[in-house]
Amino acid sequence: KILVFGPRDRYDVYRPPFADEMPVELVFRRPDQTYVQAAQENADARIIFVDAITDVGPDVMDQLPELKMIHSEGVGYNCIDCQAARERGIYVCNNKGCNAESVAEHTIMLMLMALRFGIPGHNAVIQGQQIQMKQKAIAAHAPGLFQCAVGLVGFGDTAQATARRLASFGCKLYYY
């Protein structure tokens, strides 16, 4: 049995077609349940799927005597008490790099928004002040992304995806 703490509609988006053929019972936590209540009602679950911000500590693990694995549906697992899992012989897994591409795109969007006064510019257009905003932007001598040097701390999946995209802008790239 797999107990899924996230909502079914989100899970179904990523669920592979062959999943229906697997001899596994999927149970989804009801929105009105706490994680502990869901664990108590599904004490025979051997695996739980959680999102990156679900707190999974001894209070949940102790309700699941058959638990063998906690799987984060994302990259993060910092809300899972890994020490408590280790003490109980429970594996903790994540989806390394699964969202690197979308995080890289989001990162570059934020860079462009900052360089191009995205939010103030949007607000100025709504208020009919786009000419005044244009003058402020020009006076600020804001560089284009191609004129920037970008430093990436670490060079894992997300940084590599970001670097690939930034290369097309022509900026200088550095990583540590």
For the regions a language model picked out, list residue spans one by one.
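Rossmann-fold NAD(P) dinucleotide-binding segment
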Residues: 54-67
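Rossmann-fold NAD(P)-binding glycine/threonine-rich loop
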Residues: 78-90
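N-terminal glycine-/charge-rich "phosphate-binding" loop or analogous flexible N-terminal tail
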Residues: 1-47
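Hydrophobic Val/Ile/Leu positions in short beta-strands of Rossmann-like dinucleotide-binding domains
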Residues: 4, 150-152
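Phosphate-binding beta-alpha-beta segment of Rossmann-like dinucleotide-binding domains, i.e.
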Residues: 88, 95-149, 161
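Short beta->alpha connector loops at strand-helix junctions that form conserved
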Residues: 30, 51, 73-74, 90-101
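NAD(P)-binding Rossmann-fold cofactor-contacting core
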Residues: 168-176
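Hydrophobic/small residue at the entry helix of a nucleotide-binding pocket
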Residues: 158
